[in-house]
């Protein structure tokens, strides 16, 4: 079963970062899992295999999601070609390259669907698209949009935040902070959030959460030292 799991995980992630993982990938996965004690390696592989099969998005999965968003009438209205022509794509991410990668992939799908890419868009001045792969803590999208709202954003705008995976708590946090900045700016800016999957991580819903939270701090010196050094104590 051990080798089967290595092969299964490798097959799922074979296109990760454009296929840049060291080959053969099963050996790479094995080197990764060997950092853990031998007794827990099999359970870890079982869980990783299970989770990745449910939430790993291959490049084709991402392209399919973007094509779906492109065709969503609730987003575009009756004339999707006109909507996308008028929309402006924000390239304002303060760190990393995920937004640039998503914009390039979206442009490819737009070209296939309507015959033009994002460089031919932006003919209007009211609709703006913020693309990214995921919203986790919400800090990235929050800071990006806060800076834009306080700077280049027009007095009135509609912003669509489109991402693959969205953590409920991260979106709630980001949206709350962004709304504060909008009010302070005096601008009229509406934010709408779109996602392929939503992961529940709000503490209020810990019993049905999609993330695992500790219920107790083990009596282990290394763990206790780590917890003591945390800026905010964990919620148990």
Regions found by a protein language model. Give the residues of each.
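Short, well-ordered alpha-helix to beta-strand connector turns
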Residues: 125-126, 156
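Structural motif
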Residues: 88, 127-129, 160
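Ser/Thr-glycine-rich phosphate-binding loops at phosphate-binding pockets of nucleotides
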Residues: 131-140
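"Short basic amphipathic alpha-helical interaction patches in structured regions
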Residues: 102-106, 141-147
């Amino acid at each position: 079963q051990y080798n089967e799991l290595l092969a299964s995980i490798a097959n799922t992630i074979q296109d990760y970062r454009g296929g840049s993982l060291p080959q053969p990938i099963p050996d790479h996965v094995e080197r990764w899992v060997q950092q853990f004690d031998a007794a827990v390696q099999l359970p870890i592989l079982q869980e990783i295999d299970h989770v990745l099969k449910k939430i790993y998005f291959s490049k084709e999965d991402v392209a399919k999601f973007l094509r779906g968003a492109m065709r969503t009438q609730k987003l575009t209205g009756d004339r999707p070609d006109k909507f996308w022509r008028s929309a402006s794509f924000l390239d304002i991410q303060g760190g990393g390259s995920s937004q640039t990668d998503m914009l390039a992939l979206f442009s490819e799908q737009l070209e296939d669907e309507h015959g033009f890419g994002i460089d031919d868009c932006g003919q209007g001045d009211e609709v703006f698209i913020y693309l990214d792969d995921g919203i986790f803590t919400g800090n990235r999208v929050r800071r990006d949009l806060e800076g834009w709202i306080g700077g280049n954003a027009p007095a009135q705008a509609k912003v669509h935040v489109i991402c693959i995976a969205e953590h409920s708590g991260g979106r709630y946090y980001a949206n709350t902070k962004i709304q504060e900045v909008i009010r302070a700016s005096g601008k009229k800016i509406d934010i709408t959030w779109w996602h392929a999957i939503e992961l529940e991580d709000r503490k209020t819903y810990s019993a049905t959460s999609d993330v695992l939270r500790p219920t107790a701090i083990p009596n282990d010196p290394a763990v206790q030292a780590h917890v003591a050094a945390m800026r905010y104590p964990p919620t148990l």
